[in-house]
C-alpha cells in the first residue's frame, strides 16, 4: 500500500512516504482494534514517524522541509494554565468531502492538567475545549508561546471538566522517552542522519512481524 501525505489548505496530495518507526508495543496491544469503527485509547505510545521518499509528481524534493522546532525538555507544573495553539485538519469541517475540502484550522486554548503513564514524567497534556476538539484533529501539533511543539493531539478529553471540544495530547518528551527506551536512539537521532537506511532496517526487521499481527486479527 502507498502512504500519501497531503499538505496545504485545502489539503492536496504532495508526497509519498514510508514508515520510519511505529512502537511495536502499541501495535501489539491494539492489533485487535484494527477493524474497530471508533477505536479509543489513552495515547500511550500512540505515534508513528514517516519518511518522505518522493513527490507525487516526481518533482525534486526540497533540500529542507520547513518545520516547527520540537521542545525536547521535560515539562513542569508551570505548563498548567499556559496558553497554547492546537492545529490540524479536523474533518468535521470538511462538509463531508475530506478528499477535496480538508482545510487547516487552529485554535488558542490552554493546558488544564498534566498526566503521567508512570510515576512522575509528564506524558499527557489536558487541553481546554476549543474548535479543534473534533474528529480528525489527532496528530496535530500543540505549540507553546515560544513557538515550540510541546505535544501531539492524541485523543478527545474530558468535556465535563474542560468544556466542549477538550483534547488530550501526548508530550514530545513522552515520544522521545519511549522511542529511546525501545531503540536506544532518541527522537532527534531518528529524525537526522541516514533516515533512508533507518527506514529500510525497520522495514526488514519489524514490519513483517507487525504486519503478521494485524493480518491474524483481520483473518479471525
Name these PLM-found stretches.
Residues 1-2, 42-47, 79-81, 106-108, ...:
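Extracytoplasmic
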Residues 12-31, 80-85, 102-116:
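Beta-strand/loop subdomains of soluble extracytoplasmic proteins
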Residues 29-41, 53-101:
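Active-site substrate-binding loop(s) of clan PA
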Residues 46-48, 180-220:
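PDZ/PDZ-like groove recognition
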Residues 53-69, 95-189:
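Active-site region of chymotrypsin-like
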Amino acid at each position: 500500500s502507498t502512504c500519501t501525505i497531503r499538505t496545504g489548505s485545502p489539503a492536496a496530495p504532495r508526497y509519498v512516504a514510508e514508515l520510519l518507526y511505529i512502537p511495536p508495543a502499541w501495535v501489539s496491544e491494539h492489533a485487535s482494534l484494527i477493524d474497530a469503527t471508533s477505536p479509543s485509547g489513552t495515547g500511550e505510545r500512540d505515534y508513528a514517524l514517516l519518511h518522505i521518499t518522493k513527490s507525487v509528481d516526481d518533482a525534486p524534493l526540497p533540500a529542507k522541509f520547513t518545520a516547527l522546532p520540537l521542545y525536547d525538555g521535560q515539562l513542569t507544573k508551570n505548563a498548567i494554565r499556559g496558553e497554547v495553539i492546537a492545529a490540524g485538519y479536523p474533518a468535521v469541517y470538511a462538509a463531508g468531502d475530506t478528499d477535496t475540502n480538508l482545510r487547516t484550522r487552529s485554535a488558542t486554548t490552554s493546558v488544564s492538567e498534566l498526566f503521567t503513564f508512570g510515576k512522575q514524567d509528564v506524558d499527557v497534556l489536558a487541553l481546554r475545549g476549543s474548535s479543534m476538539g473534533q474528529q480528525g484533529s489527532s496528530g496535530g501539533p500543540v505549540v507553546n508561546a515560544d513557538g515550540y511543539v510541546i505535544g501531539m493531539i492524541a485523543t478527545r478529553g474530558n468535556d465535563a471538566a474542560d468544556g466542549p471540544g477538550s483534547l488530550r495530547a501526548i508530550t514530545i518528551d513522552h515520544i522521545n522517552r519511549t522511542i529511546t527506551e525501545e531503540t536506544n536512539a532518541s527522537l532527534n537521532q531518528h529524525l537526522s542522519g541516514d533516515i533512508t537506511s533507518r527506514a529500510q532496517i525497520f522495514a526488514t526487521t519489524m514490519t513483517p512481524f507487525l504486519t503478521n499481527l494485524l493480518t491474524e486479527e483481520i483473518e479471525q
